[in-house]
Amino acid sequence: MAKIGKKHQEALKLVDRSKSYEIKEAVELAKKAAKANFDETVEAAFRLGVDPKKADQQIRGAFVLPHGTGKTQRVLVFAKGEKAKEAEAAGADYVGEGDYINKINQGWFEFDVIVATPDMMAEVGKLGRVLGPKGLMPNPKTGTVTFEVEKAVNDIKAGKVEYRVDKSANIHVPIGKISFDDQKLVDNFVALTEQLVKVKPQSSKGIYMKNASITSTMGPGIKVDVSNFR
């Protein structure tokens, strides 16, 4: 059994594990409990009342957080002609066609998100075995397969996050850095929660927003009261 460090033990003492906190208080606690010597990422986790085995309850999408995530995303765009120029003008880090497909096949992954125009997907699709396991495959549901490359790049650079329910009906999404102002983390959490409520499947029965929590990279999980969103 792994030994719990002294700093982590101190952080655990700050949190009542049986209590669900208002989001503002939860953020304050997360900051007090953050003991690492780097700018920890704050992540929100949700347990939803859906059955991921049912096709119409496999929640997946993307959303631009009001205050971004605090992380600069490196964007690779597969496009040609005018769309390639559009991507470059929008600030994409890498733009190309077959040359980048070859680089990826050789183990190059110096990017965080891929955007592809639909006419490039026949070629990009060949990278499925490489990109799929890493969660990097472009997808229309997340706005990364599109001819609107300028908007796609701008959204990603502005702090767009992807969300996807796992097989246990959980969703995990970064909502910022521990260095963010409290209100920015609160705003991001509330906006994300409202977005998840918007995409609630019609076939979902009972309580939809079962529970939620936030945690920093090295900190304890802190339950958040989401009863107002159910």
From Swiss-Prot:
Statement: the UniProt record of this protein carries the keyword Oxidoreductase: no
One GO cellular component term: large ribosomal subunit
Biological process (GO), any one: regulation of translation
Annotated signal sequence range: none
Keywords: Repressor, Ribonucleoprotein, Ribosomal protein, RNA-binding, rRNA-binding, Translation regulation, tRNA-binding
SUPFAM superfamilies: Ribosomal protein L1
GO molecular function: rRNA binding; structural constituent of ribosome; tRNA binding
Keyword Ribosomal protein appears in the UniProt entry: yes
Gene3D superfamilies listed in its UniProt record: 3.30.190.20, 3.40.50.790
Matches recorded under HAMAP family: Ribosomal_uL1_B
Record's subunit section: Part of the 50S ribosomal subunit.
Entry similarity comment: Belongs to the universal ribosomal protein uL1 family.
NCBIfam families to which the protein is assigned, alphabetical: rplA_bact
Family annotation (PANTHER family): 54S RIBOSOMAL PROTEIN L1, MITOCHONDRIAL, LARGE RIBOSOMAL SUBUNIT PROTEIN UL1M
Role noted for this protein: Binds directly to 23S rRNA. The L1 stalk is quite mobile in the ribosome, and is involved in E site tRNA release. Protein L1 is also a translational repressor protein, it controls the translation of the L11 operon by binding to its mRNA.
Listed name of the protein: Large ribosomal subunit protein uL1
Natural source organism: Oceanobacillus iheyensis (strain DSM 14371 / CIP 107618 / JCM 11309 / KCTC 3954 / HTE831)
Taxonomic classification: Bacteria, Bacillati, Bacillota, Bacilli, Bacillales
